Amino acid sequence: MIRRLAIADRGMLLDFFEQHWGGPMMVTRGQITHADQVEGFVWEQAGEWLGLITFVMRADDHGDGGCASCEVTSLDSMAERRGIGSALLDAVIAEARLRSAARLWLITTNDNLHALRFYQRRGWRLVALYPEAVSAARQIKPGIPLIGFDQIPIRDELELAFDL
């Protein structure tokens, strides 16, 4: 069911990012990550993608000379409460360990309470708040909505980390 993204998946990956993320790029902490730059795993059943996780291995930890890290750039489950998101996250954790990463990290927005619950239940911790960072991201990607989940204004980025 879980398999690594392949080169042949790029077209479907771009379509997925367009549909679920408003375009083929993600903007976090002012940095652009294009869909064609990510690695990932997909949960596929009968040719249909039920889940997708993407990540980028980073040479150092936020430029401070630390150990290599793995940034989770997206996680989507189209069939909630079936363990798909957890299984995909476990696949990335295993991959990061194989590549000797010291930690995983990700950025989410202040409105994404579901993600905050999901990751913290799995041992991730909040490590940074970037106030008004989404305003800067909108300069790069204007399609980022002003209002998010539960009618919460989207303003801030939050960084979560998981030490390996």
Regions found by a protein language model. Give the residues of each.
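Acyl-donor-binding surface of acyltransferase catalytic domains
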Residues: G143-L146, L158-L164
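Conserved active-site tyrosine of GNAT-family acetyltransferases
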Residues: Y119, W124
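A generic structural micro-feature
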Residues: D64-C67, D150-D156
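Acetyl-CoA-dependent GNAT
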Residues: R4-E80, S86-D90, E95, R99, ...
